[in-house]
């Protein structure tokens, strides 16, 4: 099941980025709910909040190392554990952004909540939600088993 989650996250991420590039790049931004939620095309050459701009090789190396650690952890965990599914969400997001960095030299972002200081993408969402769930499990459910 974990491999299905990884594949789903990568597919959803890459498909939505394709749509963003095709439809948003020419117009820049589309207000879905004016002053609250926009779809805004951004080529992110750094990390969150614009940190470490133009460090593509650095991000590729870090992502590969983290990916290896995630895969190793997933192999060691029971196949059907919530921990495994959570790591699969994070791995899928990491792979989605890695594909962009290798293929394009930047990550396509497009989800733009006007009250939040950064534009992000589906991969980022799965990484953050996966990390929050993992943190919860580790703190309140007694660590990784």
Swiss-Prot record:
Its EC number is 3.4.23.36. One of its GO terms (cellular component) is plasma membrane. GO terms for molecular function: aspartic-type endopeptidase activity. It is a multi-pass membrane protein. Pathway: Protein modification; lipoprotein biosynthesis (signal peptide cleavage). Keywords: Aspartyl protease, Cell membrane, Hydrolase, Membrane, Protease, Transmembrane, Transmembrane helix. This is Lipoprotein signal peptidase. It comes from Caldanaerobacter subterraneus subsp. tengcongensis (strain DSM 15242 / JCM 11007 / NBRC 100824 / MB4). The gene is lspA.
């Amino acid at each position: 099941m974990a491999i299905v989650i990884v594949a789903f996250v990568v597919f959803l991420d890459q498909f939505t980025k394709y749509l963003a590039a095709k439809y948003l790049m020419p117009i820049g931004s589309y207000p879905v709910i004016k002053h609250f939620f926009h779809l805004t095309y951004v080529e992110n050459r750094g990390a969150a909040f614009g940190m470490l701009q133009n460090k593509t090789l650095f991000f590729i190396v870090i992502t590969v190392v983290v990916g290896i650690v995630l895969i190793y952890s997933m192999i060691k965990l029971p196949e059907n554990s919530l921990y495994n599914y959570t790591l699969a969400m994070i791995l899928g997001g990491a792979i989605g952004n890695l594909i962009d960095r290798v293929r394009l030299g930047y990550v396509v972002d497009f989800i733009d909540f006007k009250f939040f200081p950064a534009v992000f993408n589906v991969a980022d969402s799965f990484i953050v939600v996966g990390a929050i769930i993992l943190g919860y499990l580790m703190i309140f459910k007694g660590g990784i088993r």
